C-alpha cells in the first residue's frame, strides 16, 4: 500500500517515457563494465494515495541488483515543453503569491515556498546520490511528515491549484520552481533553473533526519553542508535566505522573525547578525535562541556564523555588499536545487524567468 499524501492528487503522476539509470561508479572508474537500467514509464492517473507504483514495477529489482552503487538521476524533459511553458507555470505561481498575500499575518507564501524548495533539495547525500529534488518524494508521507518539515504543508497546499492547471510538470520541478519564483518575486536575484526532474516511487524517499538541526555550532554546520557538497561561501550565502519569513514555535520550536523585511529578499540577515545586541534566552518551548531588543531572533546555527572566523569574514562581506550576496546566493541555490541530477548534453540551457513586473503583469 502506498502512503503518499492526498493533498495534491496530480503530483503523483510520472512523466511520459522518462528513465532512471543506475550505474556503478566504481566500475566506471576502473573502466570495467557498468550496470545500467532503463525503465520506460506511463503516466499514472491515480492519486498519490491510490495504490499506484507509478509504472515502476521493475525498479525495485534493478535497485536490488545495484544496491551498493550510487544512483544516477538523468534529467528528462517532457516532450514538447519549452521555456514558454515553464514561464507560464512561473507566472501562475507568481500571480497566486500576489493574490494570496494574507498568509502568516501578511508575510505571504513566498518564504514557505523557498523553504519547501530548500528542504526537498536538502535531503541529498553526495555519497550515494539519494534524496534531493529529483524524485519529488516530498509527496510521500515519510518525507511529508518529517518533523523537520513541519509547516511546509502550507506551501504544498498552495501549489495544488498550480499543478491542476499544469498537470504535466513533475513534482520535483514544481517544488523547485516554486522556490525560484518566490525568490525572484520577493525582489531577490535571478535564479537559473533547469527542468527534467522525474517523479520516482515511494521506496526512493530518503529517511528522516537529513535536514539540519538548528541548535548546533559552526562545526556542525560545516560538516552538515559537506554532505551537500557546499563550501563555506555557499553555506553562508544559502543561510542568508533566513531574511525571509519567521520561525513558528509550533513548527520548529523557535519563535520570531529574523528581521523586519521578512517578505523582501535582502542582505538584512547579515546586517542583523553583526549589528543587533543579541542575548541568549530560552523560549516557551525551552529551546535556546538569540533574541534582540528589536524583536528579532537568530537560531544557534545562525549565530554560529559570527563565532567562526571563516564564516564571519563572509558574513561581513555580504553585509557590506548586497550585490555580491545576490550573485553568490543565486549560484548556491541553483546548485542546491540541481544536486544529484545529471543533465544530458542535449538538455535545454538553464531558464532565466522574467518576473511579473518585467512582463508588465
Curated annotation (Swiss-Prot):
> Which reaction does this enzyme catalyse, per its entry?
2 Fe(II)-[cytochrome c] + H2O2 + 2 H(+) = 2 Fe(III)-[cytochrome c] + 2 H2O
EC code: 1.11.1.5
Q: Which domain of life is it from?
A: Eukaryota
Question: What residues does the transit peptide encompass?
Answer: 1-67
Question: How is the co-factor bound, per the entry?
Answer: Binds 1 heme b (iron(II)-protoporphyrin IX) group per subunit.
This protein's GO cellular component annotations are:
mitochondrial intermembrane space; mitochondrial matrix; mitochondrion
Q: Which residues form the active site?
A: 119 (proton acceptor), 258 (tryptophan radical intermediate)
| Cofactor(s) recorded in Swiss-Prot or TrEMBL | heme b
Record's keyword terms, sorted: Heme, Hydrogen peroxide, Iron, Metal-binding, Mitochondrion, Organic radical, Oxidoreductase, Peroxidase, Phosphoprotein, Transit peptide
What would be one Pfam family of this protein? peroxidase
Q: How is it modified after translation?
A: CCP1 precursor is processed by the rhomboid protease PCP1, which cleaves the N-terminal hydrophobic transit peptide. The m-AAA protease (composed of YTA12/RCA1 and YTA10/AFG3) is required for CCP1 maturation: m-AAA protease promotes membrane dislocation of the CCP1 transmembrane segment within the transit peptide to ensure the correct positioning of CCP1 within the membrane bilayer, allowing intramembrane cleavage by PCP1.
What the entry lists under InterPro entries is as follows: Ccp1-like, Haem_peroxidase, Haem_peroxidase_sf, Peroxidase_I, Peroxidases_AS, Peroxidases_heam-ligand_BS
* Binding locations of heme b: 242
Role played: Destroys radicals which are normally produced within the cells and which are toxic to biological systems.
What is annotated about its quaternary structure and interactions? Forms a one-to-one complex with cytochrome c.
The record's comment on protein family reads: Belongs to the peroxidase family. Cytochrome c peroxidase subfamily.
The miscellaneous remark of the record is: Present with 6730 molecules/cell in log phase SD medium.
Q: What is this protein called?
A: Cytochrome c peroxidase, mitochondrial
Q: Which organism is it from?
A: Saccharomyces cerevisiae (strain ATCC 204508 / S288c)
Q: Which gene encodes it?
A: CCP1
Amino acid at each position: 500500500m502506498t502512503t503518499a499524501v492526498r493533498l495534491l492528487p496530480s503530483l503523483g503522476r510520472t512523466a511520459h517515457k522518462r528513465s532512471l539509470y543506475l550505474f556503478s561508479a566504481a566500475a566506471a572508474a576502473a573502466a570495467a563494465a557498468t550496470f545500467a537500467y532503463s525503465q520506460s514509464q506511463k503516466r499514472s492517473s491515480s492519486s498519490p494515495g491510490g495504490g499506484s507504483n507509478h509504472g515502476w514495477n521493475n525498479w525495485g529489482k534493478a535497485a536490488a541488483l545495484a544496491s551498493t552503487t550510487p544512483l544516477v538521476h538523468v534529467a528528462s524533459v517532457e516532450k514538447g515543453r519549452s521555456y514558454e511553458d515553464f514561464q507560464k507555470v512561473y507566472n501562475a505561481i507568481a500571480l497566486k503569491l500576489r493574490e494570496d498575500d494574507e498568509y502568516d499575518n501578511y508575510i505571504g507564501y513566498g518564504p514557505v515556498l523557498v523553504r519547501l524548495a530548500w528542504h526537498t533539495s536538502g535531503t541529498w547525500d553526495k555519497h550515494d546520490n539519494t534524496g534531493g529534488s529529483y524524485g519529488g518524494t516530498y509527496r510521500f508521507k515519510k518525507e511529508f511528515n518529517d518533523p523537520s518539515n513541519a509547516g511546509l504543508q502550507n506551501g504544498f497546499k498552495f501549489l495544488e491549484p498550480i499543478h491542476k492547471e499544469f498537470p504535466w510538470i513533475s513534482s520535483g520541478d514544481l517544488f523547485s520552481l516554486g522556490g525560484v519564483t518566490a525568490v525572484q518575486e520577493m525582489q531577490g536575484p535571478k535564479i537559473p533553473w533547469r527542468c527534467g526532474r522525474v517523479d520516482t516511487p515511494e521506496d526512493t524517499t530518503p529517511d528522516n533526519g537529513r535536514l539540519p538541526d538548528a541548535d548546533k555550532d559552526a562545526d556542525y554546520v560545516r560538516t552538515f553542508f559537506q554532505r551537500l557538497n557546499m563550501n563555506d561561501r555557499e553555506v553562508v550565502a544559502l543561510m542568508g535566505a533566513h531574511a525571509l519569513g519567521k520561525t513558528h514555535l509550533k513548527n520548529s520550536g523557535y519563535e520570531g522573525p529574523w528581521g523586519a523585511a521578512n517578505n523582501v529578499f535582502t542582505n538584512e540577515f547579515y546586517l542583523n547578525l553583526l549589528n543587533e545586541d543579541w542575548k541568549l534566552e530560552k523560549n516557551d518551548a525551552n529551546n535556546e535562541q538569540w533574541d534582540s531588543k528589536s524583536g528579532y531572533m537568530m537560531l544557534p546555527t545562525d549565530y554560529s556564523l559570527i563565532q567562526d572566523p571563516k564564516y564571519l569574514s563572509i558574513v561581513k562581506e555580504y553585509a557590506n555588499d548586497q550585490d555580491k550576496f545576490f550573485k553568490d546566493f543565486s549560484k548556491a541555490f541553483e546548485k542546491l536545487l540541481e544536486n544529484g541530477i545529471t543533465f544530458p548534453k542535449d538538455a535545454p540551457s538553464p531558464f532565466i524567468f522574467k518576473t511579473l513586473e518585467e512582463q508588465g503583469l
